[in-house]
Amino acid sequence: MSELQKQWAKARLGSQALGQPPAEMPITTTMPEFNEADEDKEMAGPSPGGFPFDDDSSSASSVSSTGTVIPSPGRALFARPQGFASRSMDPIPWTTYFERELFLKEEAGPDSGSRTSNKNKPTSITYHAYLTSPVGKGPLFVTHHGAGSSGLSFAVLSSEIRKRLPNAGILSLDARGHGSTTVTAASSVPGEGDETTGQAPPPLDLSLSTLASDLFTVIQLTRTAMHWPELPPIILVGHSLGGAVVTELAKSYRLGPSLLGYAVLDVVEGCAMDALQSMQTYLSTRPQGFASLKDGIDWHVRSRTIRNSTSARTSVPGLLAPVEELQRPELQQLPRGVAGTQGTAKPWRWKTDLAATQPFWEDWFVGLSKKFLEARGGKMLLLAGTDRLDTELTIGQMQGKYALQVFPEAGHFIHEDLPEKTAIALVDFHRRNDRSQLVLPPKVSDLLAQGKKV
């Protein structure tokens, strides 16, 4: 309010108090001098009525806007953020998503299909898997994780699939050297197949052919354990390394007509081979351990390795274990980086030492694109970006040899970052390849036998 207005208001109030007519506001042709500092003070002051001005049509009225929140003087305005205070990093148990867990033991012996080490010492392997059984004639989605992950990588996805296809089943295994699957040296004493020799286990074989054979064995052992008369219709789903494994199994046609199709998540031969060149550099920058399981989950979310906190809270517990547990002889199939870390500052370590798997990297991905296009069954490729396509797959996609879906907003772990969208794509893929929905026309011979004209 200008000085002239103040004088007029004072005179008006005084005349009213004395019962005199109100004075007219003087008219002046001289405008008061504009003072920018005074104007700013007036604009910053409270609005009439003592209430702060609030315009709901303005973005400034949003709760997230700094214009509507006036902090107290003692509040640290420029303090460093302390993370997601309201976001829980508590682990989510596997029972939230799966019906049961299976420990499937493959005995050592010449007729049992057991593996042998380079020194021809028989080994015994106990596969660990998570299962939700299919209902009726529902399909079974069999999933295989990538290197360094576990079967829990597909936990949240399995729940989303069941929401859209309630009769579907999901079988998610831990590959050898991952999760809770263990390989031991079998006893040489007859009748003691469940015991170990007490010696160090043989070197772990992570070749592509072995992993594909493991996947087939897990499917067969699950059928036996669940007393299924026959295999349900199967959709194979593999992420990264798992994509190469399911492609290898599909190309072998060992599952026969039970296999409806296979889906590969974010792995392409050319892109994978290029990425291997920088893998050791990436591993050297990754933390060697964590102070707690919650810290491990928090790191995966903050580093955007996994962009969905619910997925991280579910899958990360399958990647880490206390140092004491990793030092058990039956779990030392791979060097796990425990040496020289006797302190307890970061007792939670990676279950799988990815650097030690380097001898197998090239074997996993060489020829992947060709095998993917040649294998029988429906084919689908889910990518986080079209730049990942190599020449062979680009030509195949133009020829309509497989279905392609791209999620540019996802990271490498597509199924964990976007479980809902991935589930929608997989359920739609199953429906397109579901043979039970096919309606075939009647045979001519049957029509003639019924006396109908053809």
From Swiss-Prot:
Reactions mediated catalytically: [phosphatase 2A protein]-C-terminal L-leucine methyl ester + H2O = [phosphatase 2A protein]-C-terminal L-leucine + methanol + H(+)
Pfam families registered for this protein in UniProt: Abhydrolase_6
Entry annotation: catalytic residues: S240, D266, H412
GO molecular function: protein C-terminal methylesterase activity
Class of enzymatic activity (EC top level): hydrolase
Function of the molecule: Demethylates proteins that have been reversibly carboxymethylated. Demethylates the phosphatase PP2A catalytic subunit.
Name of the protein in question: Protein phosphatase methylesterase 1
Gene name for this UniProt entry: pme-1
